[in-house]
Amino acid sequence: MTKANEDAIPEGDYKYVWTPTSNVPLDDFLSKYKPSMVENDGTKPWIWVRKGGDTRSFTPADEIAVLEESSKILTEITDQIENIKNDPSIPTRSNKKTGAKSKKEVREELQRDARERFEEIARKYKYLCGKWLMFASTEKIDMIWSSLATSLINGPLADTDAFCAKVATTPRDANPNHLHVICLYFPDVYNKDAVTKAMKILLRNHGFNLSGVKSDMYTLLGIDSKHPSGIPSTIWKNKDLMDDKEIQALKDAFFAELKGGKSSIAQSPDKADPNDKKPMDVSAASADKPKTKRKQKDIFASDDDDDNDGEQKRRAELMQKKKATAVSKRRSDKDKDSDEDQEKPKRKAARRS
């Protein structure tokens, strides 16, 4: 899948897309197509849930123009960043007496300028779309994805500008520490109020860990955390929208309520008492918070096998393949993730999503 179409909503006979006009209920769709169970053979990298029509207003010609203009800027900035690195006249440290700026300061000025120019191009062609990024481990992804998708269609996220969500399926060579990326799409990610409203719901009603807001233009350009330009891969970091204390308070309130055993479908913040918001999905949140281990349900179980007589055999083969992969990877000295984006959080000894 190329960078140009990673964010394009599939059309035609791609069966891993749900819309309000689909002939199956959302719950059935989510039960049938679980990201931990759908193996990406190169033809089904994503599972999509769409709230309504695509609200993005650019044309294919606009997208081509965006790519051409922004690519020139990116090449220019990348070359300048490399020149700064190799320029001996620019000091490593700034000098207050002479007023000389450090390499880091000069580099960051160029990167800020590039971000501003990218935004100008985005507004010029109305290429303003983008997404909130989240990550979850394979063992937790099904519940977390189901919670998000349900919220988008029938829960508090339905009252936001978010119009679509997608989750990465499981690569054939997934290692034991694999993380699935989840994207929640907005027509205008430069609308700070809109993305912040959704952020509060994702924290307070779901307890999710968030990795920032990324413009589709940046995906189109291939800008990630390892890009040689050093341009930040997200246009909004969590701290740009809310302070750490507020973020932690919302998550603490969610998990405190969860610990107390309360369970109800949450209202949106606009319709509910801000001091009395309930979690959207207790089971999904439990998957995102460490707790006493219990015997888990077979992750290969499915609720609907009617359309595939060989499904049971495929599951057994897939389970054996996953077990073999896990054993092989544990014996390896290297552990390389294969997620679509480079913004995923670094994994520590304690596994979390």
Residue positions per predicted region:
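Acidic, polar low-complexity intrinsically disordered regions
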Residues: 29-177
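Phosphorylation-prone, low-complexity intrinsically disordered regions
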Residues: 1-18, 353
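Alpha-helical interaction elements in eukaryotic regulators
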Residues: 22-25, 140, 144, 148, ...
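Structured partner-binding subdomains within large eukaryotic complex subunits
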Residues: 165-305
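Polar/charged alpha-helical tracts
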Residues: 31, 123, 248-256, 313-317
